[in-house]
């Protein structure tokens, strides 16, 4: 069924297709119909960040920026759903066109630029949703907020989403907001993490529960830079790391239509680069901090490869666009087939 739907959707522009798909998934969720689209994955519970996940395969942030279809995505069988990236104030993002399909490479290039309706709108949608499973909320800074004041935006968002999230992801790795990736390094990272940790402690006391914080990093770092990030995450008491966001590299899409468009590349071409980051992180973290792997999962075996590399959970986005809901079950089954000692 999804193959037919994809053929029709791919005749539309990528952003129109995205918006229509989101509307349909949202409507299906409200009517309770989405469970009919694919067989529910087997139960494969896993405990990560002190949370109990029904299975380790989640929806990556970016597909549902405003929380418009939380119930719909949950009904498809995801073990957890991450929405956002959301910013303190609404913003339109970059000019269109800003999403490009590269079907021969099972890839997507986007330069969306954190287009969203703002954190207050997102919170209202979360409150209206029926879903009571694991919900991640991904937060970022507004385009016109100077990088030097980015911490203010993250703290505003953290304050507002804290009571409504199972965990919060701090996005410092989108390539489509100028200067954002500089927050991954050196004193900028340490100052941000320190501020987040202090605010997390305050909010824990205020709300009576500790909401884990995950940091989402880019795939375009050297091993040495990745090790430094890992050390900073441990030192600051963060709860998880998500590896990775999209890449600025164009390896694997050279010469393809739209292959030279500006923006972040996701899908199959980022798989090896992302998995390498997971391996480096796993070696440095040595189990002290869980890894959530994202990047290039287009088949179930790719999810298993991420787990084998050291991840505890995986997320899909571009693979979901190309393969549909069946990829969720396929990924859960592939992980379930791994020897327990490996997963």
UniProtKB/Swiss-Prot annotation:
> What molecular functions are annotated in GO for this chain?
dihydroorotate dehydrogenase (quinone) activity
| Class of the enzyme per the UniProt entry, highest EC level | oxidoreductase
- Tell whether Transcription is among the UniProt keywords: no
User: Which InterPro entries does this chain map to?
Assistant: Aldolase_TIM (IPR013785), DHO_dehydrogenase (IPR050074), Dihydroorotate_DH_1_2 (IPR012135), Dihydroorotate_DH_2 (IPR005719), Dihydroorotate_DH_cat (IPR005720), Dihydroorotate_DH_CS (IPR001295)
Q: EC?
A: 1.3.5.2
Instruction: List the SUPFAM superfamilies.
Output: FMN-linked oxidoreductases
Keyword terms, alphabetized: Cell membrane, Flavoprotein, FMN, Membrane, Oxidoreductase, Pyrimidine biosynthesis
Gene3D superfamilies linked? Aldolase class I
Query: Pathway listed for it?
Result: Pyrimidine metabolism; UMP biosynthesis via de novo pathway; orotate from (S)-dihydroorotate (quinone route): step 1/1
* Binding-site residues, FMN: 61-65, 85, 138, 171, 216, 244, 267, 296, 317-318
Q: Write out the catalytic residues in the record.
A: 174 (nucleophile)
A single BP term in Gene Ontology: 'de novo' pyrimidine nucleobase biosynthetic process
Annotated positions binding substrate? 65, 110-114, 171, 176, 245-246
Q: How does it sit in the membrane?
A: Peripheral membrane protein
**Cofactor mode of binding and number, as noted:** Binds 1 FMN per subunit.
**Protein origin, superkingdom:** Bacteria
Q: Name one Pfam family in it.
A: DHO_dh
Query: Could you say which protein family the record assigns here?
Result: Belongs to the dihydroorotate dehydrogenase family. Type 2 subfamily.
General function of this protein:
Catalyzes the conversion of dihydroorotate to orotate with quinone as electron acceptor.
Assembly: Monomer.
- Mind telling me what this protein is named? Dihydroorotate dehydrogenase (quinone)
Q: Which organism is it from?
A: Pseudomonas savastanoi pv. phaseolicola (strain 1448A / Race 6)
| GN (gene name) | pyrD
């Amino acid at each position: 069924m999804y193959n037919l739907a994809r053929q029709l959707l791919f005749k539309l522009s990528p952003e129109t297709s995205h918006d229509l798909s989101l509307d349909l998934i949202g409507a299906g969720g409200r009517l309770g119909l989405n469970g009919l689209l694919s067989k529910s994955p087997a139960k494969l519970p896993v405990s990560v960040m002190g949370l109990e996940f029904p299975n380790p395969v989640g929806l990556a942030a970016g597909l549902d920026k405003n929380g418009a279809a939380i119930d719909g995505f949950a009904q498809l069988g995801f073990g957890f759903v991450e929405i956002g990236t959301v910013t303190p104030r609404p913003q339109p993002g970059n000019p269109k066109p800003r999403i490009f399909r590269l079907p021969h490479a099972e890839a997507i290039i986007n330069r969306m630029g954190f287009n969203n309706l703002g954190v207050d709108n997102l919170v209202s949608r979360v409150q209206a949703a029926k879903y009571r499973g694991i919900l991640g909320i991904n937060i970022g800074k507004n385009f016109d907020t100077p990088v030097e004041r980015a911490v203010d935006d993250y703290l505003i968002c953290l304050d507002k989403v804290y009571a409504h999230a199972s965990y919060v992801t701090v996005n410092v790795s989108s390539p489509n907001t100028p200067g954002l990736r500089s927050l991954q390094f050196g004193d900028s990272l340490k100052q941000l993490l320190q501020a987040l940790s202090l605010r997390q402690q305050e909010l824990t006391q205020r709300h009576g529960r500790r909401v884990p914080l995950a940091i989402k990093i880019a795939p375009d770092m050297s091993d040495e830079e990745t090790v430094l990030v890992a050390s900073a995450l441990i030192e600051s008491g963060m709860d998880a790391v998500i590896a990775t966001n999209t890449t600025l590299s164009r390896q694997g899409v050279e010469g393809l239509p739209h292959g030279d468009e500006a923006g972040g590349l996701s899908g199959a071409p980022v798989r090896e680069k992302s998995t390498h980051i997971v391996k480096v992180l796993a070696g440095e973290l040595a189990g002290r901090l869980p890894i959530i792997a994202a990047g290039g999962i287009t088949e179930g075996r790719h999810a298993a490869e991420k787990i084998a590399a050291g991840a505890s959970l995986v997320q899909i986005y571009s693979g979901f666009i190309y393969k549909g809901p069946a990829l969720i079950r396929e990924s859960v089954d592939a992980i379930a087939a791994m020897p327990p000692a490996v997963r």
